[in-house]
């Protein structure tokens, strides 16, 4: 009886997963990306350079969490083994053309990420310790007046990012270290738990500081390896680019044909850069923006989507396509295909490098995923006791994931993430007019040659903002008195 019930549950989860990630989410997120790209006048292309400037400028020391620290934290969550194994799977399933569609969806997703991160900044709050918190749950409550909607979103995010995805990352780390060096999985798990506990028990600020140290190292190291493969195979680059375009448009036979390439590439891109999911918006709200305007964080997170997909995922694609592993059947897929490609190009030592990369990618994802979930726990309850228990449960899932494969839990997390995205897209579409007006205000100030700052009194249609952040207390009191009279 129990076995039949579990089989039915697993079947239902797999069906829902296929429905969400095979069609519904692809259409919804692509439509949202197109809508926001058009309404913002292709801002991701027009002001791309300005966005890069803000990421670099975000390194300046300020009170609280800097824009660069937030950028690194969101990148820590975005960039994981999916940027390696996931790209390999997309190419295996959809052929080289999947890369083209992955690039296209990232460019559209940059506009969606801009909208959600701007809204997260507009409706952020300050907790009892003076730390900014925000994200979809907060703009659903304050912007739409729908706390119930924010509650649903928070629960879905906590399940996916707080528990399940962290067990996935821990499992990947222990497998990598066990395979490369033969280390005992239980010992590895305990080390991961202790290292994670040290960071997450320090709260958002410690997570941000750790991400600021880890992310640049892991990104530069991985890009250096990809660049080495690129340089040694530079003569093959034109042919590889031609194959990507031809396969995407159906001019070349591919594993799954033109449609297979499209679906595989779009799904991989969406899952990797998380644009529209509402995940990165949680940490975007924690920044003390520079310039002091909500839209500045929109620019920063827009660049995050670009780096994740156009830079990191493309590096994995280059390693695989230029190595020649696709030309001969080898039975490898996922991370195994990438490992084979590196071995062919760089030799056996690359196994150790890949293990090192996986450790950095996965550990940084664990602490960043936790930071997303923490803000949603604090949305549901302000209790420090509940937060303490939550941290214990996160660490327990990390330990369990280190020693056991939890495929059912992980598949359920994909469902949670998919539902989370649908809830978030509905919210940002309903709040899009607010985002458009705030972003337009930023652009007008930028064009006039002044450093953009946000004056909420110019936006009487935006209410329910927290006093002391974008509205000072005197202005808020005066506004309330005027409305009463």
Predicted regions and their residues:
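N-terminal alpha-helical transmembrane segments of multi-pass membrane transport
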Residues: 1-81, 91-98, 399, 429-457, ...
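Extracellular loop-to-transmembrane helix junctions
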Residues: 17-50, 92-130, 307-315, 351, ...
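Transmembrane helix-loop junctions in multi-pass membrane proteins
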Residues: 25, 40-44, 82-87, 162-174, ...
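Membrane-interface loop-to-helix entry segments
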Residues: 28-35, 39-52, 171-177, 183-233, ...
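Helix-loop-helix module between adjacent transmembrane segments
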Residues: 32-37, 108-130, 136-200, 356-366
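Flexible loop linkers connecting adjacent transmembrane helices
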Residues: 42-67, 89-91, 95-99, 111-144, ...
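Alpha-helical membrane segments and immediately flanking helix-loop junctions
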Residues: 61-93, 119-137, 141, 258-306
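Extracellular/periplasmic helix-exit of transmembrane alpha-helices
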Residues: 115-124, 225-243, 256, 285-291, ...
């Amino acid at each position: 009886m129990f076995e039949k019930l579990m089989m039915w549950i697993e079947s239902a989860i797999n069906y829902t997963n296929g429905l969400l990630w095979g069609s519904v989410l692809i259409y919804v997120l692509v439509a949202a990306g197109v809508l926001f790209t058009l309404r913002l006048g292709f801002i991701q292309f027009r002001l791309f350079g300005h966005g890069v400037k803000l990421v670099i400028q975000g390194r300046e020391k300020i009170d609280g969490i800097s824009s660069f620290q937030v950028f690194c934290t969101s990148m820590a969550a975005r960039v994981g083994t999916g940027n390696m194994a996931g790209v390999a799977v997309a190419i295996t399933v959809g052929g080289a053309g999947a890369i083209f569609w992955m690039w296209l969806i990232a460019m559209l997703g940059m506009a969606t990420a801009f909208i959600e991160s701007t809204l997260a900044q507009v409706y952020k709050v300050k907790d009892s310790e003076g730390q900014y918190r925000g994200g979809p749950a907060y703009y659903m409550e304050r912007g739409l007046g729908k706390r119930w909607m924010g509650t649903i979103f928070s629960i879905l995010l906590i399940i996916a990012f707080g528990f399940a995805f962290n067990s996935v990352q821990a499992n990947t780390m222990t497998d990598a270290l066990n395979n490369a060096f033969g280390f005992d999985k239980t010992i590895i798990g305990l080390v991961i738990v202790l290292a994670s506990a040290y960071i997450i028990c320090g709260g958002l600020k410690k997570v941000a500081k750790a991400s600021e140290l880890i992310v640049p190292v892991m990104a530069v190291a991985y890009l250096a390896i990809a660049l080495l493969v690129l340089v040694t195979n530079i003569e093959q680059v034109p042919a590889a680019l031609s194959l990507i375009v031809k396969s995407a448009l159906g001019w070349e036979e591919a594993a799954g044909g033109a449609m297979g390439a499209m679906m595989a590439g779009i799904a991989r891109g969406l899952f990797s850069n998380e644009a529209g999911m509402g995940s990165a918006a949680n940490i975007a709200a924690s920044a003390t923006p520079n310039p002091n305007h909500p839209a500045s964080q929109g620019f920063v997170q827009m660049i995050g989507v670009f780096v994740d997909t156009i830079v990191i995922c493309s590096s994995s694609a280059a390693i695989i396509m230029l190595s020649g592993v696709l030309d001969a059947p080898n039975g490898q897929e996922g991370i195994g295909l990438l490992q084979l490609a590196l071995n062919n190009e760089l030799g056996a030592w690359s196994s150790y490098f890949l293990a090192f990369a996986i450790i950095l990618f996965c550990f940084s994802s664990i602490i960043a995923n936790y930071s997303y979930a923490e803000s949603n726990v604090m949305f549901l309850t302000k209790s420090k006791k509940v937060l303490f228990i939550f941290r214990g449960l996160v660490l327990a899932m990390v330990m369990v994931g280190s020693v056991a494969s939890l495929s059912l839990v992980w598949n359920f997390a994909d469902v949670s993430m998919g539902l989370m995205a649908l809830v978030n897209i509905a919210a940002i579409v309903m709040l899009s007019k607010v985002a458009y007006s705030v972003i337009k205000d930023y652009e007008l100030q930028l064009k006039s040659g002044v450093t953009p700052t946000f004056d909420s009194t110019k936006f009487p249609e935006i209410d329910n903002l927290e006093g002391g952040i974008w509205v000072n207390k005197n202005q808020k009191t005066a506004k309330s008195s005027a409305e009463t009279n």
